[in-house]
Design a protein with these regions (language model features):
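Short, internal strand/loop/helix patches
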Residues: 32-61, 65-67
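Short, glycine-anchored, charge-dense loop/turn motifs used at functional sites
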Residues: 65-87
Length: 239
């Protein structure tokens, strides 16, 4: 979040606006502390239903969609890191619990395209439609993730789970969220939402480790390993 605030401050006078969206079924209570800590000058929204998944093809965070001054999408949802994570440079200390050690190993392997991605945004702001990073409508469609039957059913299952969760039926929510995970196993936002709700104690901040529970077959670390490790967690930036 600080990186996006800094980028906005740098380029807002040239026409750039940043809108951040927190995906969290916990709503304002879950997201507000993060927004208040960042104290952003740009709009910060909350998406309790993960509607941006459904509308724009978001499957992980952070993702971004570029929309020009005419309201046209010029880059579809894609990984959107603009700051190098210090975790990737840290030396992993000895004596850590095995699971935390293994998680840090995978985090250090996550692809870092932050410098190139930030430079692409700056180029777009400077050059508009002439920027090589502003895609044609056909290219936007070609790069957008397909929405097949399984992905559509997964979106419906996730929404059913969220409705039951809001109604206090946690067991019912888990059933439908498990089905969403089965139908769309590459959607990390569905998984991470369910895992964090399952592993976060009442009244505590969201559990970012999203470790194993009895409710779901997967968890962050094991699913990352199963997908080929941290290097495959985000697809590479495609100019």
């Amino acid at each position: 979040m600080p990186g996006w605030q800094a980028l906005r401050a740098e380029l807002h006078d040239k026409g750039l606006e940043i809108v951040t969206i927190g995906l969290d079924a916990g709503g304002a209570d879950a997201v507000r502390p993060w927004i208040e800590a960042a104290n952003p000058e740009h709009p910060s929204l909350i998406d309790e239903t993960h509607i941006v998944d459904e509308l724009f093809g978001v499957t992980n965070v952070p993702n971004a969609v570029w929309i020009d001054e005419h309201g046209m999408i010029v880059r579809p949802a894609e990984p959107a890191n603009i700051e190098h994570s210090p975790l990737q440079d840290m030396e992993i200390p000895d004596g850590l619990p095995e699971r935390i050690h293994d998680m840090l190993v995978e985090v250090k392997e996550i692809r870092d395209d932050s410098e190139a991605y930030r430079a692409a945004i700056v180029d777009w702001v400077e050059n508009g439609a002439d920027s090589p990073y502003a895609l044609s409508p056909d290219a936007v469609v070609a790069r957008s993730l397909p929405r097949g039957r399984d992905e559509s059913e997964a979106a419906a299952c996730f929404e059913l789970g969220r409705h039951l969760h809001d109604a206090g039926d946690d067991d019912g929510a888990v059933t439908w969220w498990r089905e969403a995970h089965r139908l769309d196993p590459n959607n990390w936002t569905y998984k991470r939402q369910a895992w964090s709700l399952a592993s976060t104690a009442p009244g505590e901040p969201s559990d970012l480790m999203q470790g194993p529970t009895d409710l779901y077959e997967g968890n962050w670390l094991d699913d990352v390993k199963a997908s080929g490790g941290g290097a495959n967690y985000y697809p590479s930036f495609q100019p």
